[in-house]
């Protein structure tokens, strides 16, 4: 019984952490995943991954198909996780967002690394930002 109580306690702590990151999910706790919006499903996927208390989280195309407000909420959560010391492996085409949350960046082209360095170095490299990051 003690283990079950501890497990429930840990589960509740983890759930509360996820709901603090994504308060919008708190309103939908009784909903089936299929009845959630695309943004809520993305938040749920991240929250579900966080329930295992990982040190690393991998996210692919977070902003794809989401409304700007939902993208903002998701990236605010990523910033909090980063500030807590979590390693985030993010595959994203939205360069502005990558530069917002990344410490280090690796630019790939056709599966090959064409540039690797800090986000600050990426911002300060006009050839890189124009050629690969789509920024002028």
Regions found by a protein language model. Give the residues of each.
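Helical segment within the ABC ATPase nucleotide-binding domain
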Residues: 71-84
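ABC ATPase C-loop
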Residues: 49-50
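A short, surface-exposed alpha-helical micro-motif characterized by mixed small hydrophobic
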Residues: 98-100
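ABC-type ATPase nucleotide-binding domains, specifically the catalytic core motifs of the NBD
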Residues: 1-13, 21-26, 117, 135-136
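Short, glycine/charged-rich "phosphate-handling" switch motifs in NTP-dependent
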Residues: 104, 116
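Conserved ABC ATPase signature
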Residues: 32-36, 40
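Conserved catalytic motifs of ABC-family nucleotide-binding domains
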Residues: 53
């Amino acid at each position: 019984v003690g283990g079950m109580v501890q497990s429930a306690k840990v589960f509740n702590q983890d759930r509360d952490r996820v709901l603090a990151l994504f308060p919008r999910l708190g309103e939908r706790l009784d909903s089936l995943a299929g009845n959630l919006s695309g943004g809520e499903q993305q938040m749920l996927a991240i929250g579900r991954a966080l329930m295992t208390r990982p040190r690393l989280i991998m996210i692919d195309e977070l902003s794809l198909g989401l409304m700007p407000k939902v993208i903002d909420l998701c990236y605010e959560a990523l910033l909090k996780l980063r500030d807590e010391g979590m390693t985030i492996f993010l595959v994203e085409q939205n360069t502005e967002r990558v530069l917002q949350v990344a410490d280090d960046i690796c630019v790939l082209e056709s599966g090959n690394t064409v540039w690797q360095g800090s986000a600050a170095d990426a911002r300060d490299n006009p050839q890189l930002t124009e050629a690969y990051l789509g920024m002028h």
